[in-house]
Amino acid sequence: MTSPIHVNSEIGKLKTVLLKRPGKEVENITPDIMYRLLFDDIPYLPTIQKEHDQFAQTLRDNGVEVLYLENLAAEAIDAGDVKEAFLDKMLNESHIKSPQVQAALKDYLISMATLDMVEKIMAGVRTNEIDIKSKALIDVSADDDYPFYMDPMPNLYFTRDPAASMGDGLTINKMTFEARQRESMFMEVIMQHHPRFANQGAQVWRDRDHIDRMEGGDELILSDKVLAIGISQRTSAQSIEELAKVLFANHSGFEKILAIKIPHKHAMMHLDTVFTMIDYDKFTIHPGIQGAGGMVDTYILEPGNNDEIKITHQTDLEKVLRDALEVPELTLIPCGGGDAVVAPREQWNDGSNTLAIAPGVVVTYDRNYVSNENLRQYGIKVIEVPSSELSRGRGGPRCMSMPLVRRKT
């Protein structure tokens, strides 16, 4: 059986990708709650949708099949006849303290067509949408100024993080912050019930019920044998070691994991915000993760004796990559040309977050013009997409895309 998921590199020609078009959840961000929702600004919906549509069309123009999360989730719920079960689980994870409110929300949402229900859950439910008359103390004492019964999920257009394709399977992730933890429920129901994915041979290497955090922006597929995973603000060292044991024990094909330690800060939340693979022997890198002499703490995980994991510490990232990928030479291309001002400015707007759609061909944000021109000087074909509003969410083209199928390199 051929798996519907097949990703054995970061650079193989992209064949199928999962996106989420920004929707009304973006308009439900307010200044009072945007930081808790992990946003630094409020995008303008008509423009962010136009930019995202251009991003999707750019992928289609390059032969990529584009699937949308909201459509797959609704199709899966209907195919599995699990509308009520899915809604119950979503409500239980939405931290609704009042039984009366939860019951009213269930009645409100379950009455909708499935796609409408999915989009409303993603957008969030405001308190003025449902008239709840309750004299229960928990409701009387509720915060009258808070506008939502169910919080919006504006980060959903970053489909890379809730789940990550890996070989002929994927991880469905336990997200770090409460604002994003419900997101991986959509991929869970797709894998369980969608006819294209359920029982079709795709392995779930790690599910969302784990205690330790992991997010797809930290998971890079360097080759059919080697992974790189960031030890970051969003992915723990413990989760990497747990995943290594599963992959090594279950004939995944992966023989080595490079655990790369990066600063635990919002500007560098995932490994792919500071480091991406763009060709067989070329990577982008943000100089801010490198210490003296360009050193980066890297831990090499390999199978050991008696199901143990052998871990080796090195700091010369370039050498580690050369050895792991078995290439004689390798180039780390600095974001913003390594300039002290340009590099952090363009990294903030995801200058390092490139999406390779084929070896040496990348999609980037147009606003990072110094980094883009620098890539061209190294022989990389750069396809720019507009980004004035997309970039406000602090994620780039790689963050906004979850490859499902790549051609083997």
UniProtKB/Swiss-Prot annotation:
Single Gene Ontology BP term?
arginine catabolic process to ornithine
- This protein's UniProt keywords: Arginine metabolism, Cytoplasm, Hydrolase
- Pathway listed for it? Amino-acid degradation; L-arginine degradation via ADI pathway; carbamoyl phosphate from L-arginine: step 1/2
Assigned EC number: 3.5.3.6
GO cellular component terms? cytoplasm
Top-tier EC class: hydrolase
- UniProt xrefs under InterPro entries: Arg_deiminase
- Superkingdom of origin: Bacteria
* Catalytic activity line of the entry: L-arginine + H2O = L-citrulline + NH4(+)
GO molecular-function term, one example from the UniProt record:
arginine deiminase activity
Instruction: Indicate the residues that form the catalytic site.
Output: C399 (amidino-cysteine intermediate)
Looking up NCBIfam families in the UniProt record yields: arcA (TIGR01078), PRK01388.1 (NF002381)
Matching entries from HAMAP family are given as: Arg_deiminase (MF_00242)
- PANTHER family annotated for this entry? ARGININE DEIMINASE (PTHR47271:SF2)
Its protein name is: Arginine deiminase
| Originating gene | arcA
